[in-house]
């Protein structure tokens, strides 16, 4: 303040800066919070499955000779489709997400994003992914992506999830589609190796999901979702986990004629390791011991990544296939 009762120019600027800085910080925090909320709707961790399985499928389709631009465009389109499906799944499951401890922090469960905005966001991602794949790859891959979203939202989320304990068995087919999309983006068709990769993920999904659901079975009971561990005994669940683990390993071995020796060796060794864990879980339950199903859940991720990474390396370096 000057001696004449006036505010000095420097003081005005300083005061303005002091008033604007908190507002700027708050505005930035709100924007960042909104961006992170929309990102969380897409379930980025789930999208990792796309990267782990789609790239090896594309490399196998052309024995490593596929153009990098095709890979990039397919991954972008595939990730948008997966993000759209996951967002729409969050919209449909908002009511049960509020009840379950594991999902209570999801954006719609805590009202961080308006439901209508999330719905528009999910639909927009789905439509854009279809046209992206159609224009950058081919119509078949775009249609497969569109069918995947529709199946995941309407068949799994709205029809199966709340009605049957076999929900993840049949609903898990949506998670198998990245290999089909990747293969079709490169070749424009579908062939038996793509179906074999589909089978690997199809059979892998139940033991992977049920192992996690065993840990959170009380959540599913509270939400009224008939996930197998919530409606069956631990012995019944672990027996089913063991059966599907065997089917998973057999499916990986069925793919060996189209792959090279590296994949065959890794599939055999990793399969033995995966089976050992499943047998240990089942044996522990039968013996009445305290078991740790979450360990199988976490290691099942490593198993799938290891098998498909071996397939990618095998295809990229062009090792001779077992078919010659």
From Swiss-Prot:
It catalyses: heme b + (2E,6E)-farnesyl diphosphate + H2O = Fe(II)-heme o + diphosphate. Coiled coil: none annotated. Keywords: Cell membrane, Heme biosynthesis, Membrane, Transferase, Transmembrane, Transmembrane helix. Pathway: Porphyrin-containing compound metabolism; heme O biosynthesis; heme O from protoheme: step 1/1. It is found in: Cell membrane. It is a multi-pass membrane protein. Gene3D superfamilies: UbiA prenyltransferase. CDD domains: PT_UbiA_Cox10. The chain crosses the membrane at residues 65-85, 117-137, 139-159, 164-184, 185-205, 237-257, 258-278, 304-324. GO terms for molecular function: protoheme IX farnesyltransferase activity. Belongs to the UbiA prenyltransferase family. Protoheme IX farnesyltransferase subfamily. Carbon 2 of the heme B porphyrin ring is defined according to the Fischer nomenclature. This is Protoheme IX farnesyltransferase. It comes from Mycobacterium ulcerans (strain Agy99). The gene is ctaB.
């Amino acid at each position: 303040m000057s001696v004449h009762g006036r505010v000095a120019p420097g003081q005005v600027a300083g005061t303005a800066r002091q008033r604007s800085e908190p507002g700027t910080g708050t505005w930035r925090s709100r924007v960042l919070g909104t961006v992170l909320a929309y990102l969380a709707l897409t379930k980025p961790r789930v999208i990792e499955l796309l990267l782990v399985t789609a790239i090896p499928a594309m490399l196998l389709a052309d024995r490593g000779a596929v153009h990098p631009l095709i890979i990039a465009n397919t991954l972008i389109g595939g990730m948008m489709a997966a993000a759209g499906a996951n967002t729409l799944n969050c919209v449909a499951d908002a009511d049960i997400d509020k009840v379950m401890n594991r999902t209570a922090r999801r954006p719609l469960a805590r009202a961080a994003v308006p439901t209508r905005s999330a719905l528009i966001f999910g639909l927009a991602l789905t439509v854009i992914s279809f046209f992206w794949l159609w224009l950058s790859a081919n119509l078949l891959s775009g249609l497969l992506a569109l069918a995947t979203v529709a199946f995941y939202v309407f068949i799994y989320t709205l029809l199966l999830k709340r009605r049957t304990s076999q929900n993840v068995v049949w609903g898990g087919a949506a998670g198998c589609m990245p290999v089909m999309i990747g293969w079709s983006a490169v070749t424009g068709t579908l062939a038996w190796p793509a179906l074999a990769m589909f089978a690997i993920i199809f059979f892998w999904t139940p033991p992977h999901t049920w192992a996690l659901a065993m840990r959170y079975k009380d959540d599913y009971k509270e939400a009224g979702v008939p996930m197998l561990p919530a409606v069956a005994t631990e012995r019944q669940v672990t027996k089913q986990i063991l059966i599907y683990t065997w089917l998973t390993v057999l499916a990986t071995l069925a793919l060996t004629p189209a792959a090279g020796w590296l994949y065959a060796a890794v599939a055999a060794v990793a399969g033995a390791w995966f089976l050992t864990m499943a047998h240990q879980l089942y044996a522990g339950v039968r013996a009445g011991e305290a078991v740790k199903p979450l360990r199988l859940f976490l290691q099942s991720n490593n198993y799938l990544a290891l098998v498909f990474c071996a397939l990618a390396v095998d295809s990229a370096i062009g090792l001779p296939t077992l078919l010659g």
